[in-house]
A protein has these predicted regions:
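Peptidoglycan glycan-strand catalytic modules in the bacterial/periplasmic cell-wall system
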Residues: 1-171
């Protein structure tokens, strides 16, 4: 039986999580087409949970005083490092271990980093005590901890939680 927080995370952040080895080629192609053909350079949408973990473990250098070419080169280099790290993580750990590591490193907002801190901050519970609605709310925070904060933006938090619940039901 998959804990609700894991089910919520996978259904929202990486629906093909169990079927790839750290890099989701279908998502990469989709993002590539969106970026190149449609000239849509909005960030996000192609990283797997494993890639997001790699990024959390080894943050990018975000210096802003570089030229556009230098920033692009740095982004490409960091993406390749992220992919290699994701493949190594998948080789050395189980999917359950990777999901747990991710949940223990991600920001949930309100100064809560990691699922244990988030469960205590928002619900005064241990992670294993979360019900499906609470797990869905926390999983929804990952995309935008401030935008979907139940404290700052309760309407957004509720709508995001409901989206996560819908995705869980569809999975």
């Amino acid at each position: 039986d998959v804990p609700p927080i894991i089910a919520a995370l996978i259904s929202t952040e990486d629906v093909r999580y169990r079927g790839h080895s750290g890099i989701d080629l279908m998502s990469l192609v989709r993002v590539g087409v969106k970026t190149v053909l449609m000239q849509n350079t909005s960030q996000g949408g192609g990283s797997t949970i494993t890639q997001q973990l790699a990024k959390n473990l080894f943050p990018r250098d975000t210096a802003r005083n570089r030229s556009r070419v230098a920033r692009t080169a740095k982004l490409v280099t960091s993406k390749f490092k992220e992919w290699i790290t994701a493949l190594k993580l998948e080789y050395n750990y189980t999917k359950e271990e990777i999901a747990a590591m991710y949940l223990n490193t991600v920001e949930f907002g309100s100064n809560a980093y990691g699922i244990k801190s988030a469960a205590h901050t928002f619900f005064n519970k241990e992670p294993h005590e979360l019900n499906i609605q609470e797990a869905a709310l926390l999983a929804g925070l990952v995309k935008g901890p401030t935008m979907y904060s139940p404290r700052r933006n309760p309407e957004n938090a509720l709508a995001r939680r409901n989206l996560v619940l819908d995705r869980m039901a569809s999975a």
